[in-house]
């Protein structure tokens, strides 16, 4: 299928080790389109749903960013790190160690509180369920991570933190609609190996810990690293994130999403539109003349495709402008005459209560994003050219 000036969405399954911007750069290079953006940053350690818009669909990104999201993650309890994830340095916390020993004695029948103990997972299940239900479900206040992209007086929080400056972020309201414990594994962490799987044996210096696999559905702006930190803090033993995968952004979901929060008839069929990717390396010479090697994101396409063939394959796997608009916000079917009126900046006689995509269904023409003008009329706030 030949594509000339395309607009739409690609649902990228972002691999670990690259930034969201790396994925955007991969799409921009493959499609030869300058106007490309994404709906919500994923950290390099995270994988999963990255909604990337190109062409006129980039004007839908603000709506998509605001959608709720689902993640599957692993929270390690028993230690804290400087960044609240496995990329940070371990923080020695004698109070947390003492609390772990106390819990060990309480949750293990006949346990000795003076020795490192891998606690039985059955005992933890009940404690975690009660703690999550009481403190981390529904509407809560959350302090974002110090190492976050939030700006403070024009500077990113993570830049200030790396410079050793004090970073004070205010709590913000978030909503947790699901926080389910999927699996629990107990074991030991050897030294500074914060990202390694738990060991079964307690070598000298090993720290007892618990890996908790969870599924979390939450409002936009929720920091899963902060939930890991706060769960560990509430239990008194410390906690950080070792794995994070985003499986859903609003109605845009990966095939492995198991949240069940969106009715099947409302969920977009992104199975045939998801494009996987992998991490590779690129070597280049920077402006200082130094040879630098860093990770890059490579989109997975059939072997042998290149140039226009590869571009067209990706576009054939993208959501169309109409599919993108219907997934991004409420949609209203309009007539060709109404589409013409909207493109001239005129109001149409329609009753709506929220920003809505105005679409001519017969021609799949997304004419505009409209909003309420008065009780009986809607007005255009964003107009799209006729494709």
UniProtKB/Swiss-Prot annotation:
* InterPro entries reported in the protein's UniProt record: PsdUridine_synth_cat_dom_sf, PsdUridine_synth_N, PUA_sf, tRNA_psdUridine_synth_fam2_C, tRNA_psdUridine_synth_TruB, TruB_C
Q: Does the keyword tRNA processing apply?
A: yes
What are its E.C. numbers? 5.4.99.25
Q: Which residue positions are annotated as catalytic?
A: 43
Write out the catalysed reaction. uridine(55) in tRNA = pseudouridine(55) in tRNA
Keywords, in A-Z order? Isomerase, tRNA processing
Q: Which organism is it from?
A: Bifidobacterium longum (strain DJO10A)
A GO BP annotation? mRNA pseudouridine synthesis
What's a Pfam family this protein contains? TruB_N
From the UniProt record, which GO molecular function terms apply? Answer: RNA binding; tRNA pseudouridine(55) synthase activity
What name does this protein carry? Answer: tRNA pseudouridine synthase B
Summarizing the function annotation, the protein's role is: Responsible for synthesis of pseudouridine from uracil-55 in the psi GC loop of transfer RNAs.
Q: HAMAP family of this UniProt entry? A: TruB_bact
């Amino acid at each position: 299928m030949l594509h000339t000036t395309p607009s739409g969405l690609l649902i990228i399954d972002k691999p670990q080790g690259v930034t969201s911007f790396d994925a955007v750069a991969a799409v921009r290079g493959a499609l030869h389109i300058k106007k490309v953006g994404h709906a919500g940053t994923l950290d390099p350690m995270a994988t999963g749903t990255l909604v990337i818009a190109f062409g006129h669909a980039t004007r839908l990104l603000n709506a998509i960013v605001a959608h709720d999201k689902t993640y599957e993650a692993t929270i390690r309890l028993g230690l804290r790190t400087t960044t609240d994830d496995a990329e940070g340095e371990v923080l020695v916390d004698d109070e947390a160690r003492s609390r772990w020993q106390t819990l060990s004695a309480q949750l293990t029948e006949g346990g000795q509180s003076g020795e490192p103990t891998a606690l039985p997972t059955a005992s933890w299940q009940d404690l975690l369920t009660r703690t999550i239900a009481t403190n981390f479900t529904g509407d809560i206040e959350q302090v974002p991570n110090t190492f976050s992209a939030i700006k403070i007086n024009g500077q990113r929080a993570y830049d200030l933190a790396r410079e050793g400056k004090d970073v004070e972020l205010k709590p913000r309201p978030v909503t947790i609609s699901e926080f389910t414990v999927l699996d629990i594994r107990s074991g030991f962490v050897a030294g500074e190996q914060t990202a390694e799987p738990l060991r079964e044996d307690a070598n000298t210096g090993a720290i007892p810990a618990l890996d908790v696999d969870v599924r979390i559905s939450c409002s936009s702006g929720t920091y899963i690293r902060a939930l890991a930190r706060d769960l560990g803090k509430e239990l008194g033993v410390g906690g950080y994130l070792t794995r994070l995968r985003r499986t859903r952004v609003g109605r845009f979901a990966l095939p492995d999403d198991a949240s069940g929060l969106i009715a099947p008839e409302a969920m977009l069929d992104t199975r045939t539109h998801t494009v996987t990717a992998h991490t590779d390396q690129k070597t280049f010479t920077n402006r200082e003349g130094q040879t630098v090697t860093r990770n890059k994101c490579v989109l997975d396409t059939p072997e042998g495709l290149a140039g226009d063939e590869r571009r067209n394959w990706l576009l054939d796997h993208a959501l169309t402008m109409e599919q993108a608009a219907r997934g991004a916000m409420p949609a209203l079917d309009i007539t060709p005459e109404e589409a013409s009126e909207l493109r001239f900046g005129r109001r149409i006689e329609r009753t709506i209560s929220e920003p809505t995509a105005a679409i001519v269904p017969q021609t799949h023409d997304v004419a505009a994003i409209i909003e309420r003008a008065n009780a009986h009329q809607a007005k255009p706030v964003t107009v799209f050219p006729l494709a």
